[in-house]
Design a protein with these regions (language model features):
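Nucleotide-sugar-dependent
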Residues: 17-18, 216-223, 278-283, 290-309, ...
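Donor nucleotide-sugar binding/catalytic pocket of nucleotide-sugar-dependent glycosyltransferases
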Residues: 41, 132, 149-194, 198-202, ...
Length: 393
């Protein structure tokens, strides 16, 4: 009986990055659909072949994709199916229903699909990224982008089964077995506990950006956020803004012209750099608004922002612009504010609305945000079960 699904990728399981949050949520969702699961990701260090190779994280069985079983050494999963084959043999090939590969490099995805077809396992590609040019390394970018184009345009059709993070990407996969799963979380877990309800008392509004802005800030538009708060400070408005995921020095290395603005905001703006996932959630849990802004390009439209999912699950209002499927979940003026776009003027206007919101209206907004549990597993069980029932070998 084929009763097990393997989820494979470069999931940062120790740091609990966005990919790990996604993997653990999908594994819990698949288990809710009646399957057993195994996650092949990355621990902080590659386990020794004779060490304890298996860990349980949030109730899900996990192994390191670089050393999935004793023996080896194994070739890299980025170009070989050997680590997947070893894990499948450990479980029993005739028990593995599917292998889901998360944002795999093209060579690794091709090897995975070929292996699955040879042994009667259903190949799935979990695609949440369609990157564009990043940084200044020409050869690296050309090689990387060629692989990404091959994965998104050709290998998705070769696999025949694709998990999409957005309807924007799903619409580009005609004839393929697809499901849109932005995120699925077990919101009964302690990390998704919400803070006590706001009493509506007049106080300084607290804004948080928490995420990985990308190489050269290519993913998230940090510059308009800093410029917007500088404008609002000149207007005499009081606020607190915390930036998680990039330090002050790292930011100014990328945008040195903002040094005067950052200095002007020193009493209202705090850069925390990288923190643990648990610490990040604690800060988000106790803020008034989560903010982030992205260009409406294929990078933003293919994926779905983890920071949106986390804030929405914690019942925190969100200020952002419409990319991907965000417009389906964020109702302007109800559970947050939608900026008209990601430029400085548009970002300033949206944040200003958050600052001008009366205390009673803010309480109502928080209440509206908390009425929705948009990314709980129970919301996604039916479409996931339907997708798994249609899997193609």
């Amino acid at each position: 009986m084929r009763d097990t699904i393997i989820l494979a990728g470069g999931y940062d399981l120790d740091r609990m990055g966005a990919s790990a949050v996604r993997a653990l949520g999908l594994a819990a969702l698949f288990e809710r659909c009646g399957y057993k699961t195994l996650i092949l990701g990355k621990f902080g260090a590659v386990p020794a072949p004779d060490a304890q190779l298996e860990r349980t994280i949030t109730g899900i069985t996990c192994r390191d994709i670089r050393q999935p079983v004793a023996g080896g050494p194994f070739p890299s999963y980025t170009s070989s199916a050997a680590p997947l084959a070893a894990a499948a043999e450990l479980i029993g090939i005739d028990r593995v229903k599917a292998i889901s590969a998360y944002n795999y490099p093209a060579l690794g995805a091709w090897a995975m699909i070929r292996y699955c077809r040879q042994v009667g396992i259903c190949p799935i590609l979990d695609c949440t990224e369609w990157q564009i040019w990043e940084g200044r390394k020409v050869l690296r970018n050309l090689w990387r982008l060629a692989g990404i184009e091959a994965r998104m345009r050709l290998l998705t059709r070769m696999a025949g089964n694709v998990i999409c993070a957005s309807t924007w990407f799903e619409k580009r996969l005609e004839g393929v077995n697809t499901v849109v799963l932005p995120f699925a979380l077990d919101t009964s877990r302690e990390e998704w506990r919400r803070s006590p309800c706001d009493t509506g008392q007049e106080r300084v509004r607290r804004f948080v950006y928490s995420g990985s802005p990308g190489l050269g800030l290519v993913k998230d538009r940090m510059q308009p956020i800093i410029e917007a708060f500088a404008i609002l400070r000149k207007e005499g408005r009081a606020f607190e803004c915390t930036i998680i995921g990039i330090s002050r020095d790292e930011y100014l290395q990328i945008v040195p012209r903002h040094a005067p603005l950052v200095d002007q905001l020193s009493h209202s703006l705090t850069f925390l750099g990288r923190v643990t996932h648990c610490r990040s959630l604690e800060i988000v849990r106790n803020c008034d608004f989560v903010i982030f802004f992205r260009k409406p390009d294929r990078v933003a439209n293919t994926g779905f922002a983890t920071k949106f999912v986390e804030a929405a699950t914690l019942g925190v209002p969100i200020i952002t612009n419409s990319t991907s499927d965000i417009g389906r979940y964020l109702e302007d003026g109800v559970n947050g504010f939608l900026a008209d776009g990601p430029n400085t003027h548009q970002v300033t206007a949206a944040i200003r609305r958050g600052l001008e919101l009366a205390p009673d209206d803010f309480v109502r907004m928080v209440s509206a945000a908390r009425k929705r549990n948009l990314f709980d597993i129970c919301m996604w069980t039916k479409p996931a079960a339907s997708f798994l029932g249609r899997l193609r070998v």
